[in-house]
């Protein structure tokens, strides 16, 4: 559409690449399941598209034994929060002394950006919920915090629910 409007010399199509990363289970931040490998794969993404199971099927086992979309979404979110909290706390412990003494300006800037993130994560809130200055956002980009990435939830419903997804109680709970 834009190429037709502006007639550029070259048209580069937009690309949205999805990578299916299996393996995040409760305890992943402590190395369970694919654990750290899984988390490292997510760090490389620009956004997270979380597909949440909202259908019943006895032929497809659920890792927790039952379908509960809210529980499953919260499990993933908590694992991402735990992983980020570990990253942030490790970094704070390395720079805190220099930052508080005021001898290192960069350490102070980093500390001032990380401290509110740590507080939010400790309360179970994602890093993206913290208001930061433009400078702080640039500074934190290097940490590749998982909960700072945009999150899109996709309800995986049965084919029978496609025409009227509101009949699916898990979908309704998730939306």
Name each region found by the language model:
Residues 27, 60, 79, 91, ...:
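Active-site-proximal flexible loops/turns
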Residues 17, 46-53, 69-95, 113-125, ...:
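Conserved beta-strand/loop subsegment of P-loop NTPase cores
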Residues 36-40, 86, 112:
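A generic "alpha-helical surface" signal
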Residues 94-175:
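C-terminal-of-GTPase-core extension/linker across diverse P-loop GTPases
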Residues 1-50, 55-70, 74, 132-143, ...:
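Switch II of P-loop NTPase G domains
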């Amino acid at each position: 559409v834009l190429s037709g409007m502006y007639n550029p010399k070259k048209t580069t199509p937009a690309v949205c690449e999805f990578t299916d990363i299996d393996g995040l289970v409760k305890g992943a931040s402590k190395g369970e399941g694919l654990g750290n490998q899984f988390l490292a794969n997510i760090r490389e993404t620009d956004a997270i598209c979380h597909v949440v199971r909202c259908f019943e099927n006895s032929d497809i086992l659920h890792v927790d034994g039952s379908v509960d979309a809210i529980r499953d979404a919260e499990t993933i979110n908590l694992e991402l929060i735990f992983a980020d909290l570990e990253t942030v706390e490790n970094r704070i412990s390395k720079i805190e002394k220099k930052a508080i003494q005021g001898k290192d300006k960069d350490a102070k800037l980093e500390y001032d950006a990380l401290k509110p993130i740590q507080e939010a994560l400790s309360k179970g809130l994602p890093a993206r919920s913290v208001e930061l200055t433009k400078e702080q956002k640039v500074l934190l980009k290097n940490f590749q915090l998982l909960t700072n990435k945009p999150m899109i939830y996709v309800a995986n419903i049965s084919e029978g629910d496609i025409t009227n997804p509101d009949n699916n109680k898990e979908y309704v709970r998730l939306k």
